[in-house]
Regions:
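N-terminal charged helix/coil linker that caps or initiates catalytic domains
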Residues: 1-31, 64
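Short gly/pro/ser/thr-enriched loop/turn and capping motifs at secondary-structure boundaries
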Residues: 62-65, 154-160
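Conserved N-terminal Rossmann-fold NAD(P)-binding element of oxidoreductases
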Residues: 32-34, 57
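Hydrophobic/small residue at the entry helix of a nucleotide-binding pocket
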Residues: 38
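Conserved SAM/SAH-binding loop
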Residues: 102-111
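Glycine-rich phosphate-binding loop and adjoining beta1-alpha1-beta2 segment
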Residues: 51-94
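Glycine-rich phosphate/adenylate-binding loop
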Residues: 2-4, 116-123, 130-136, 143-144, ...
Length: 263
């Protein structure tokens, strides 16, 4: 069995971000809320980027219907808790990554207590699909100045090249993030039209496609498809874009701190 060599495994990040920033990434703690079609790819990309500590939050279990778009969904993991399946996968990618699994759904009642005591994470990715959870996470992250990315809805989207990253004020074609924007403005005084809200989002500028007509009522009166369709090329792109933003946050924070120290 070959011993794990972090220097060789993550040397590409040293050359891309610089030794200091890459070290900051490897010492970072990132929380991912929702380990599904988008969040599982976030966790995968963070582990492959050498992030040293991850907190994964989700209560769902892997199902057959997840196999088309979720990286931890395999024939061997069906029925397993998503956070545990992801932890096992990460151990094979980056054995030095410390992974904490929290089997729960985030809600206004348990956030941020669900994180436990101790230092705040260095960054958070919200990849859940509940507006109430997205709202409490976004407001908390802004209040505590924690780098944060909120991910929109990937269902009903086919074109990966239309995925974008922008401030919440500029998001289009995403009912989930539109609700987040509305509630931040209504309940927390977020800036109105024309001004940045300060919440970075991953979303698609593609219009949501309804389920195909072939997924209509069967002859026996049952449906053969449920909800919006989805494809891994889009869900993975959402997740990778979110992680790209977080890695840049961490790198930029290191560079800023270094420059301030010189001054």
């Amino acid at each position: 069995m070959t011993l794990f060599d972090a220097t060789r495994s993550f040397g590409g990040l040293d050359r891309l971000y610089g030794l200091g920033a890459a070290k900051a990434i490897r010492s970072a703690h990132v929380t991912v809320v929702g380990i599904g079609g988008v969040g599982s790819w976030c966790a995968e990309a963070l582990a492959r980027s050498g992030v040293g500590r991850l907190t994964l939050i989700d209560l769902d279990h892997v199902a057959d219907s997840n196999i088309n778009r979720q990286v931890h969904a395999l024939s061997t993991t069906v029925g397993q808790a998503k956070v545990l399946a992801m932890k096992e996968r990460i151990a094979l990618i980056n054995p030095e990554c410390a992974v904490e699994c929290i089997e729960d759904f985030v809600s206004p009642e348990n956030w941020p207590a669900v994180l436990g005591r101790g230092a705040l994470p260095d960054a958070v990715i919200d990849a859940c699909d509940q507006v109430s959870a997205k709202l409490v996470i976004a407001h908390w992250a802004k209040s505590h100045k924690v780098p944060f990315v909120s991910v929109g809805a990937a269902g009903g989207k086919r074109f990966a090249h239309k995925v974008d990253v922008d401030d919440l004020s500029q998001v289009t074609h995403d009912p989930l993030l539109a609700q987040l924007r509305y509630r931040l403005r209504k309940h927390h005084g977020a800036p109105r039209e024309g001004k940045k809200i300060g919440v970075l989002c991953v979303f698609s500028r593609e219009a949501v496609a309804p389920p195909d007509a072939s997924c209509a009522v069967e002859g026996d009166g049952t449906l053969n498809c449920h909800g919006y369709g989805s494809v891994v090329t889009v869900t993975a792109t959402f997740g990778l874009c979110a992680v790209s933003a977080i890695l840049n946050f961490l790198s930029d924070a290191f560079i800023k701190a270094k420059n301030n120290a010189i001054i």
